[in-house]
């Protein structure tokens, strides 16, 4: 009897446009969650938001809010903005100012406060008209870890592992070479094509995930599905992702991780 052949190179099984969502007085792009992408297809990833605006627009916005039960990662694509978080008792906000290219990783665990893009310092320095762009994503924690101690760390761009793969420049946010660890084995990569071209990058078998296109356009997967911003490309099973025909300046985030196989309970800023 002929045995089925396992596919090595992953297909792009779905290409989905991000939708616009109002949040804290702004409009942001929300590629995930999406109605056509059930959580069990992207487990352990819960949410992805892309925000883009000028810091002066933050003047009258209070972004302080609580979280619980997941890893909250905030990647600064452009500009620099202050942020705040509280991981200890009393709710005291600790300030940080991650520069462009930095990653803030907040383990919310049993509960933490967070405030994105506090722009007062930048306005005082005359930087209010600076354009700011970031991606925020939530990654679930196992139910056994949801009451863990909250913690935070900033991965600066100069400490980030950067490597060349094919025609692409790959920055490792999470995965081999990064000090940032999630509750489950995962890889989060910023992949860019300064001059266009192609790349085939490993994605461990058993991981579930997707690509989110930030700039440019390219063809994704063994089945060659074109995608452009702001589209999410859901990946099928396999051991690698092939991306071809990238135009110069193309950039996307690759997010993949080992699923928990648990059904989380979503309750606003909490994931139980």
Identify the meaning behind each predicted range.
Residues 1-272:
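Jelly-roll (double-stranded beta-helix
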């Amino acid at each position: 009897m002929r045995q089925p052949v396992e596919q090595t190179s992953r297909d792009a099984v779905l290409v989905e446009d991000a939708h616009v969502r109002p949040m804290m007085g702004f409009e942001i792009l929300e590629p995930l969650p999406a109605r056509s992408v059930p959580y069990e297809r992207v487990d352990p990833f819960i949410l992805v938001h892309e925000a883009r605006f000028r810091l002066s627009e933050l003047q009258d916005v209070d972004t302080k809010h609580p979280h619980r039960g997941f890893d909250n990662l905030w990647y600064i694509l452009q500009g620099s903005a202050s942020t705040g978080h509280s991981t200890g008792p009393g709710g005291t906000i600790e300030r940080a100012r991650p520069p462009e290219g930095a990653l803030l990783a907040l383990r919310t665990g049993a509960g933490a406060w967070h405030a994105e893009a506090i722009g007062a310092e930048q306005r005082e320095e005359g930087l209010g008209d600076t354009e700011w762009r970031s991606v925020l994503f939530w990654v679930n924690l196992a139910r056994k870890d949801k009451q863990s101690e909250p913690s935070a760390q900033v991965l600066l761009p100069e400490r980030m592992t950067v490597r060349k793969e094919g025609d692409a420049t790959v920055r490792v946010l999470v995965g081999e070479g990064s000090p940032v660890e999630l509750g489950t084995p995962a890889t989060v990569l910023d992949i860019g094509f300064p001059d266009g071209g192609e790349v085939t990058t490993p994605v461990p078998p058993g991981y579930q995930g997707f690509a989110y296109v930030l700039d440019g356009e390219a063809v994704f997967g063994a089945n060659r599905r074109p995608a452009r911003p702001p589209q999410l490309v859901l990946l099928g099973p396999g051991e690698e992702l092939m991306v071809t025909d990238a135009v110069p300046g193309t950039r996307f985030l690759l997010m993949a991780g080992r699923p928990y196989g648990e059904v989380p309970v979503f309750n606003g800023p909490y994931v139980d």
